[in-house]
Swiss-Prot record:
Zn(2+) binds at residues 85, 87, 101, 104. Homotetramer. Interacts with both DnaA and DnaN, acting as a bridge between these two proteins. It is found in: Cytoplasm, Nucleoid. It comes from the Bacteria. It comes from Lactiplantibacillus plantarum (strain ATCC BAA-793 / NCIMB 8826 / WCFS1). Binds 1 zinc ion per subunit. One of its GO terms (cellular component) is nucleoid. Belongs to the YabA family. Its cofactor is Zn(2+). Disulfide bonds: none annotated. One of its GO terms (biological process) is DNA replication. This is Replication initiation control protein YabA. The gene is yabA. Involved in control of chromosome replication initiation. Inhibits the cooperative binding of DnaA to the oriC region, thus negatively regulating initiation of chromosome replication. Inhibits the ability of DnaA-ATP to form a helix on DNA; does not disassemble preformed DnaA-DNA helices. Decreases the residence time of DnaA on the chromosome at its binding sites (oriC, replication forks and promoter-binding sites). Tethers DnaA to the replication machinery via the DNA polymerase beta sliding clamp subunit (dnaN).
Amino acid sequence: MDKRDLYDSFGEMEQQMQQMLDKMAKLRADMTTVLEKNAELVIENEHLREHMVEIENELPKKAASTTTLSKSRQNLEKLYDEGFHVCNQFYGKRRDDDESCVFCLEVIYGERERA
């Protein structure tokens, strides 16, 4: 191997090493991006789990509050189920074909402020 071939071999090796360094730098940048995205997703996942737990804890409270009607509202519900209006507008009138009445439902299930 003469000096020129040796010099050319070193030049080729230098180019290959530079290409390897460039690939390594790109891989490092890509890996950093993936790790950052993964960390963001882990945090978002934790927040979503916490939010789910909060919602699940609220559901039984809402269900319990809607199922506990006072005695008078239970009586109104019974009349309504038998086909009569219990709202102020049509109180005591029969509901045609058992259609729903928004006013009656508000009287029975609506939330009222207590003074």
